[in-house]
């Protein structure tokens, strides 16, 4: 059974938009970098995020993606947004919530866990999205066997199987009318 369905919605995670406390490793890294080196590193991270966003737009199958209704972000190992490039900012901010959910429920879960090569998909607004037409993918990144960050993209797709065309069902009478609603699940 997939852990998302076993754990269900986690309202505590949904409310954790503030940054998590710094880890000892983050504090040591912060103390060892001067302002100039930090700005150079920050600029490099900004460029990585911008290239991720532009690549996502070029690969887009939906018109909204090609027009820039996308976000690409790099998140800390705790799920906090570190840097992003976006056409619609709320995608990047809200993508913290599924990442924090993944960290809380799966990082040490023996049957799922987090491993190099994993990928997690989600689009359910109850797990941090805006609406089900906004679909996200987050991938944990490891260095020397240690989780160091997540990278992720959130995109707006036009169709997601709702009872009305266009991805947003204004006349929905139940959540099933809205189409595909997927909690954070491991797909790779």
Region spans (language model):
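A short, hydrophobic, proline-anchored segment that marks a local hinge/packing element in signaling
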Residues: 134-144, 152
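Mobile "lid/hinge" segments at catalytic clefts and subdomain interfaces of large enzymes
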Residues: 147-188
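General beta-strand structural signal in soluble alpha/beta enzymes
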Residues: 74, 83-85, 112-115, 121-123, ...
